[in-house]
C-alpha cells in the first residue's frame, strides 16, 4: 500500500500528498496513522500527487506531516444477517458496545444501480394501518415514499409509527439510516424496536447531527448497501431514511469546502446527480424488493426549495404534512389534498377505494372553498346541500385523525391499527350520510367507524 503525508487541513477537508506513481483513485479510503485513526475519502485529484479528501470522522488532533496510507479500495461495510439488531456508524463499526459484528463479508458503499433489465415493478399494496395514508396516498411494495414536512409537524413520529406497523406486521428485514438527525431520536428508536421485539429484524446505521459532513453524506449509502445485500438474497426489505434533506445539506457543506461554485439557494451544483445516484440504487429487482420510506425536511415550509423539489421527482407516493392541520390538533397532520400516490388508480386499488378517496378529496376541497363564505356571512347563508357537505367535511377531517402506538406515552390514548377494508367502509359511510346524526367530536382520535359510534353514545 502506498503512503503519503498531510499537506493541508481546512475543516473537514484534508489534502494529502502521495508519490506521483501511486496516487489513490477517487473514492478510495485512506487511513491517517494517528491515535484517532481517522478515515478519509478521496474526492478530487489536484495534480502533482496531491489528492483532496473529506474526513469521515473528527479532524481534531490532526496536523501537517502525519502519515496517511491508501487502503486501495472504497469504504466497505459489513453486510448480511450479522448486521441485524446492531447499531453501526458510517464505516460499519459497531457503536452499541455489543462486541464486533460476526461477519467476514463486506461490500463497498459505492455500487452501480441495477440495470434496466434487472429491475422489476409491481402493484401490490402495502397496508400501513394509518387511515389517511391507506386512503389517499396508498403505498406499494417496492415503492418509494416521501414524508414531507417543516420543523415539528411530525415526520419522525409518522416514520416511527410506519416502522412499528409495517415492521411488526411485515415479517421481512428492515434497515434504518439515521442521517443528520437527533441522537436522542436514534436512542428512542432503538429502545422502541427492542420493546416491540423486532430489533433482531432491523439493522441500524447512524450518522447523527454532531458528525462531520463527510460522515453524514455517506451514511445513507452505508444503510443502502446493507439493504441491497438483503434484497439480492431474495428478501423484501424496508429501508427507512431519516432525514434525506440532511443528506443534501451534507453535500452542500462538502461541496463548498471542496471549492465548487454554489448553485440555486446556495446548494451544490451536483444536487440532482447526488440525489439520483442514491435514489436510483433504491429499487426492486427480480430477486427482491426495497420499499423505501424517507423523511424529507422542508426548509421554511417551502416545497419549491431545490432540495425537496429534487426529491419529489424520485418518489411513487408523497405524504405532505401540513402545519395548518397540525394547528387544528389533527394528527397525523397529513394534508389529504396535497398528498399523492401513483397507485391511486381504479385499475390498481379497485373502483370502490378510488371513488371513496376522490369523494373525500372533493368534499374537503369544497369545504376549503366555502370557508371564506362562512367566515364572512356565516353558516346560515349556505344552501342546504352545502350545509350538509360542510358537516360531512368536518366529520371526515376529524376521522382522518388517529391515535398512534408510538405516541401512547405522550397522549395517554392507546394506538389503533385500522385495516384498509375498515378505512374504506368508514369514509364511504360518512360520504353517503349514514352518520349525519352523530356529533362531529365522536370522530376525533378514534380507530374504525365502530369506535366512533360507541364514542357518540357516551357524549
UniProtKB/Swiss-Prot annotation:
ATP binds at residues 149-156. It is found in: Cell inner membrane. It comes from the Bacteria. SUPFAM superfamilies: C-terminal domain of alpha and beta subunits of F1 ATP synthase, N-terminal domain of alpha and beta subunits of F1 ATP synthase, P-loop containing nucleoside triphosphate hydrolases. Its EC number is 7.1.2.2. Disulfide bonds: none annotated. It holds the Pfam family ATP-synt_ab. Signal peptide: none annotated. Produces ATP from ADP in the presence of a proton gradient across the membrane. The catalytic sites are hosted primarily by the beta subunits. This is ATP synthase subunit beta. The lineage of its organism: Bacteria, Pseudomonadati, Pseudomonadota, Gammaproteobacteria, Pseudomonadales. The gene is atpD.
